[in-house]
Amino acid sequence: MNRGRVQLDAAIAYTLREEQARAVHDTKTYYQSHPGGEYLWNAKPRFGKTLSVYDFCKQVDAQTVLIVTNRPAIANSWYSDYVRFLGRESGYLFVSHVDALAGQPHVLDEQGYLDAAAQGEKLYKRIEFVSLQDMKGSKYFGGEYDKLRHLTELNW
């Protein structure tokens, strides 16, 4: 029985819709002309932000990607789109400590990421998904618990 786990042999090819492609293009143009700059997408629900963000990351060859959300429940949609449209063959590994993703076959915790990167000849790129609730509980972000220290040590 599958029990809701995403299982695919290979990533699915996709084509962004016109408004998604325009958003990715505009963001990439801004990114390239404003090193260290910030860009905010104010997109309607069902726009396809997840796939658009993943496409942008691939286009600019982002090495470390941090996805922070105030809704841990959406972790499953970020994860399932990663499996469907990127997968490990993209060169990205999906890293998360969010409880909703525990035990999923393509999700690594920080140590799992380090182990996977150490086994390959190349350093894998990473997409890390965290919730604000987890960050708030971390002593590195004003909380009490010794967790998520690595988030402060990476160049996002």
Question: What is the role of each PLM region?
Answer:
Residues M1-W156:
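SF2 helicase/translocase NTPase motor core
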